[in-house]
Amino acid sequence: MKNILLACGAGDSSGFIAQKMRKAAQAQGLDVSIRAVSDTEIMENIDGIGVLLLGPHLKHKFEDIQKEVAPLGVKADIIDRRCYATLDGETVLKQALKMMD
């Protein structure tokens, strides 16, 4: 199973995207776990995660967060602003899966 964690300010917006990603994954028959948390909850939810995707509004925190998660083997990136705004879960899922290859 591939484990993906999304993070935004409060976990709400990323929660909507996670829901769309789960639907896309289910439609494709993929074995993935997708969760969403607030940026303050990342480290307490990072165990077993392969990819961490941040909302675009957390770009200013990206370097610091990446430094924390990289030693744990977690790949991190920022969700494209357009995908985030339109809740394009399918494209965000593709982004995460590509990072895991």
Which residues make up each language-model segment?
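Short, well-ordered alpha-helices that flank and scaffold nucleotide-derived cofactor binding pockets
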Residues: Q19, K23-Q26, K67, K94, ...
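Ser/Thr/Gly-rich flexible loops in soluble cytosolic domains mediating phosphotransfer, phosphorylation
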Residues: N3, A76-D101
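Short acidic/histidine-rich motifs immediately flanking catalytic phosphotransfer sites
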Residues: I46-V51
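Generic structural signal for helix capping and beta-alpha/helix-loop junctions
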Residues: I42-E44, T86
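P-loop/Walker A phosphate-binding loop and immediately adjacent motor/lid segment at beta-alpha junctions
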Residues: K2-I4, G9-G11, F62-R82
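Conserved active-site segments centered on acidic
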Residues: K2-D39
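Short acidic active-site motifs
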Residues: S38-I42, K61
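N-terminal glycine-rich "phosphate-gripper" loop used for MgATP/nucleotide binding
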Residues: L54-E63
